[in-house]
């Protein structure tokens, strides 16, 4: 599978490594599947991982390295 949207360059401008990006996207996707409310009103992607990547690209979800947790930005 190839990521075309959001672009990997835009995603990596928000997260410091591909590893951090994949962990962050997976954690956020699990949260969305568990019923957490989305941080965006509209998504281009239907799947949870795609939605998580869109939230990361929009700057709505970030990594907190001190706690290794997903943080939602208002």
UniProtKB/Swiss-Prot annotation:
InterPro entries the UniProt entry points to: DNA-dir_RNA_pol_omega, Pol_omega/Rpo6/RPB6, RPB6/omega-like_sf
One Gene Ontology cellular component annotation held by this UniProt entry: DNA-directed RNA polymerase complex
BP GO annotations: DNA-templated transcription
Molecular function per GO: DNA binding; DNA-directed RNA polymerase activity
Catalytic activity: RNA(n) + a ribonucleoside 5'-triphosphate = RNA(n+1) + diphosphate
Subunit structure of this chain's protein: The RNAP catalytic core consists of 2 alpha, 1 beta, 1 beta' and 1 omega subunit. When a sigma factor is associated with the core the holoenzyme is formed, which can initiate transcription.
Family: Belongs to the RNA polymerase subunit omega family.
HAMAP family: RNApol_bact_RpoZ
Identification of the protein by name: DNA-directed RNA polymerase subunit omega
Organism, scientific name: Lactobacillus helveticus (strain DPC 4571)
């Amino acid at each position: 599978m190839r990521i075309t949207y959001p672009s990997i360059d835009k995603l990596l401008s928000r997260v410091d490594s591909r590893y951090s990006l994949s962990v962050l996207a997976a954690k956020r996707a699990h949260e969305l599947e568990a019923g957490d409310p989305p941080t965006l009103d509209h998504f281009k992607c239907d799947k949870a991982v795609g939605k998580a990547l869109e939230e990361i690209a929009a700057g709505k979800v970030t990594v907190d390295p001190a706690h290794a947790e997903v943080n939602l930005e208002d």
